Amino acid sequence: MRVFVTGATGFVGSAVVPELIGAGHEVVGLARSDDGAAALKEAGAEVFRGSLEDPEGLARAADGADGVIHLAFVHDFADFDAAGATDLRAIEAMGAALAGSDRPLVVTSGTAIAPSGRLATETDAPAPGTHRTPSEEAAVALAERGVRASVVRLAPSVHGRGDHGFVPHLIRIAREKGESAYIGDGANRWPGVHRSDAARLFRLVLEQAPAGTRWHAADEEGVPVRDLAEVIGRHLDVPVVSVPAERAGEHFGFLGRFAGVDNPTSSAATRERLGWRPTGPGLVADLDEGHYFD
């Protein structure tokens, strides 16, 4: 299969590309810079120059592919609404190019989009009002237009070497503050998945998933945030403390809105229906390997 991949040079995308190539697929990766293009060529992929802000270009690339994996997202924490709108336009453009073809379009979302405070499953509709909800709904709706569209919801912590997501930010904050913190009793849970396992799931969804389905890239149902704070405190040799919810923004900055989220997530249906078998280390074990603190 000739697969167009957006976000192909990102943390997850740079694992998805070799996963696809290793399974016999051809990859065309989206690159907006010379460095990105060089990285894709080195990985054995073709290059399509463009960006998420060019929906017409994305449509051309999708039209020339047998399938699409959409990983790119504008991670602008100052303007989530604008980032979500850009994502929606990209999905609509690529979906229109694939309409009536029954070709696969795999769209990325997050497990935190599901209702909070109970075990989330693949059948849960997204909670209203999040910046990714319109994108996920648009992707699932493409099934009615003859696109084999599906959604992969990534755990909040996709971890592994080179991670630059939430956990490295928690480590940075702990270094700056001289203490490793959690909110309240720290019992709220974040699911996790190793980068290599997430990449394998994207391939399986591309190859197998029926139209209009959602899948969960979550190896662990939920790691208590207090456990993360404790392992960070141990490695940095700083005290582990509780921060009241009303001080979350003051202590964690932009992460304050996420640090208290309780997002336990099941991937039972994903494993059963797609044969996904995560093999990477868990989040705490990955932290204990030490590379996050180099």
Q: Where are these predicted regions, by residue range?
A:
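N-terminal Rossmann NAD(P)H-binding glycine-rich loop of SDR-like oxidoreductase domains
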Residues: V3-A23
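Conserved Rossmann-fold NAD(P)-dependent oxidoreductase catalytic core, especially the SDR/UDP-sugar
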Residues: E26-V28, V74, T86-T130, S150
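Conserved beta-loop-beta element that borders a ligand/cofactor-binding pocket
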Residues: E137-R161, F166
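NAD(P)H-binding glycine-rich loop region in Rossmannoid oxidoreductase-like domains
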Residues: G29-E92
